[in-house]
Amino acid sequence: MTPFEPPAAVPRPRLERLVSGTDVRARADRLRVTAAYALMLLAVSVTLTALGRHARAAVVSEMSTNLHNLAHGHLGALVGSAFVSDGGDVYLWLPGLVCLLALGELIWRGRGLLITFAVGHIGATVIVAVGLVAAVETGRLPFSVARATDVGISYGAVCVLGALTASIPLRLRPAWIGWWLGIAVAAAVDADFTAFGHVLALLLGMALSFRLPSIPRWTGMHAALLVVGAAFAYFVLSGSSPLAAPVGGLTGAVIAVPLAGRVMRSTAAGSVSPSPFRPGSDSPSTVASRSPA
């Protein structure tokens, strides 16, 4: 009579292995910047809501990166404005922002995400400020714009979106670029300076994307983060132009795809220069070497 043998261990399902404690902790460690920023946004929002409308208005006024504050040396607003929201609806858009930032941090690590967000938030703010100064001095805009409210995360978030360009598969990249540029430009027509800042932040991100690491292989998790993050970015960019934005995006994609194909064909044709000599015939150097002395 054979002794009892315990049944062989059955391997755990793949899903269970993927969500094991070690794997979850490893992924969480790679999202420290995203998690810390989200918690700070929540903490600031909860605190300002508890303090009341007057306290929120005072903080928003102090942290606004408008011409008045920048001209008076309030350079701390360039950083502080990224943690303050003009409204109390942070709970509605924070999940989308977290997905967008998480995807960026998974691809570029924490340092890359910080650099990208800072380039968009500070870079677009400074460029917009220079443009506003010129517009006010030439009389194109009233002087009251110098005290306009300008806080929030949108410039940095849009720059992160643009910086994903190099990670988009090559065959889809022209449509990606045309779609987002079309939306941003359409929303900027007859809009305030914030919409123009979004265009600048998007262009800064796209330019920066080719100096950042690109994703080696897309997974289901990456795709899910992109879908949610892109939906959030769409609502940020479309702003007060919900009808013009999709038309602009489709127009941009329709223009960008054939234009990119034409550029690639011309580049490929220019890189191949046909030789004037048939295969096997004498080259100029060979002919010269055979000439009499």
What are these regions (language model features)?
Residues 1-24, 187-293:
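C-terminal transmembrane module of polytopic alpha-helical membrane proteins
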Residues 16-60:
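N-terminal signal-anchor transmembrane alpha helix
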Residues 31-44, 175-181, 225-230:
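Alpha-helical transmembrane segments
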Residues 49-110, 132:
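N-terminal TM1-TM2 helical hairpin plus the immediately adjacent luminal interfacial "cap"
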Residues 77, 94-102, 157-163, 178-187, ...:
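Hydrophobic, membrane-inserted alpha-helices
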Residues 106-112, 164-175, 210-221:
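Membrane-helix interface "capping/anchor" motifs
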Residues 113-144:
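Hydrophobic alpha-helical transmembrane segments of integral membrane proteins
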Residues 143-163, 168, 193-201:
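Membrane-interface micro-motifs in multi-pass membrane enzymes
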